[in-house]
Amino acid sequence: MAKKLVAVVKLAIQAGKATPAPPIGPALGQHGVNIMAFCKEYNAKTADQAGMVVPVEISIYEDRSFTFVLKTPPASVLIKKALGIESGSSEPHKVKVGSLTRAQLRQIAEQKLPDLNARDVEAAMKIIAGTARSMGVTIVD
């Protein structure tokens, strides 16, 4: 018989830097999960993505066991990394902080495609372009 799912916890954690401190400890502790086991597994699976924020969806079962699925980093983080900037614009439609080329946009869209609500890369590019615009980033051809 399949294990009964008790909860699904979604967290955004720095890759390779999961610790039992908040926000991870309280989120998993209230469900009785072995926090150190999760931290070790997460850090091992995300060691190659150091410096990125990697969202994770943790499924917690009745017997206090868990499984987790790693998602792709948020589009805003990928855009900031591509441009080499610290943060987006505080006034996105007035102050521009940089510009992305179509090739960079396509690369980010292809990376995010599995997690986006899009059927093809063109639709994913439109979603990423919208995120970029809201950060004060222009798209150039």
Swiss-Prot record:
GO terms for molecular function: large ribosomal subunit rRNA binding; structural constituent of ribosome. Pfam families: Ribosomal_L11, Ribosomal_L11_N. Keywords: Methylation, Ribonucleoprotein, Ribosomal protein, RNA-binding, rRNA-binding. CDD domains: Ribosomal_L11 (cd00349). SUPFAM superfamilies: Ribosomal L11/L12e N-terminal domain (SSF54747), Ribosomal protein L11, C-terminal domain (SSF46906). One or more lysine residues are methylated. One of its GO terms (cellular component) is cytosolic large ribosomal subunit. GO terms for biological process: translation. Part of the ribosomal stalk of the 50S ribosomal subunit. Interacts with L10 and the large rRNA to form the base of the stalk. L10 forms an elongated spine to which L12 dimers bind in a sequential fashion forming a multimeric L10(L12)X complex. PANTHER family: 60S RIBOSOMAL PROTEIN L12, LARGE RIBOSOMAL SUBUNIT PROTEIN UL11M. Forms part of the ribosomal stalk which helps the ribosome interact with GTP-bound translation factors. Belongs to the universal ribosomal protein uL11 family. This is Large ribosomal subunit protein uL11. It comes from Synechococcus sp. (strain JA-3-3Ab).
